[in-house]
Amino acid sequence: EAPVKVNAFISTLFEIAKHYNLTRESFFLAALRSYQEANNNYFEEIELQVEKFAKAYSLDLNKRLNSKDFEEILVEEYGYTIDNDELTQHNELNNLRSVFVPSSKTLLVSSETDDSQRMFIYAKEIAYNFLNITDRLFTFSWIKFDSFDQVLNNFIASYFAGALLIPRKSLVASLKTFFDKKTFSTNDFQMLMDGFTDSPETFYQRLTNVLPKDFNLKNLFFLRFSYKPERGDFQLTKELHITNLLEPHANERNEHYCRRWISLKTIQDLTETTENHVLDSQISSYNHTDNEYFVISSATKDPFRKGYYRSIALGIMINQHSLSRIAFLFVLKIKRRKVGVTCESCSISDCLERVAPPKNLERKARFLQTDMVVKEIMEKYR
């Protein structure tokens, strides 16, 4: 009987997955997120390997490195050949920044790759070699995963790259100074980021490693949105929650994410300006809980898809601990907004940004009303 029940349960999971358009890759990525969250997205063994690598190659982690440093190591130490022309000749590959051909150790890098992307690509290749990882992906960005091991190894190499580009000790020291400021300004945050990298995503991702470990700020989330103006909808393409809090979270039912989120506003602002980067922040108060988050977001053009925009957001829960570690959270000048998760599940009645009716709440109200009337009838005929 037990195997029958287990099989029925598994079949149910697959039916739910199909209903919500979940793919094999979605399951792999969900498993990876669980692994990251279980470890507070901090992995000491990878951090130590980065320090070991830097020492072995006499790299000064107290200063910003450049792509030439990494290219020299790939070519001279690992026998790589770097080709900057081939990918540009194939229009079908304009969404790729690199392809590695293992048989000849040739790394094809797109000529459209900027220096921060090139450094990340090189750093990942160094990780695969230095950590002796062979079951790996060969394109950046990835096209498909054949196994969970490839998903995990891609994460390990990416973590190594982020830790190499943004060394933990230097970042922690800079963050302590930044958090001691009595007032918050986006200019100060931009300067902090510029001291390490030109890539907002690399910087925000790195914050999710060190904030839980070195500042005990574990109630945080990371979101990445994609947007194409012609389509008009926002796609949540990446998320991470260091603790299992409910909001904000991905929605697989094509509902409309709250337009009051700063991560959506920065994208909208970017589409209306000639700037290459829009940076903004707010304190988001969720209407269905008592939770408040300090959220900072960066929006840029999507480097991998023409005509698309993307935003990265980091949210830190405001509680007694975060208030004790981040001085500027006491400042009332940081704008506050009451937000929901999706329009379909939001009870804010006077929202000017609403783009869809609260049909989930309306359906719930109908069910409650029906249940109440049925109970009254049953009581009447007892």
Predicted regions and their residues:
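Short juxta-domain linker segments that transition from a proline/glycine-rich
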Residues: E1-R382
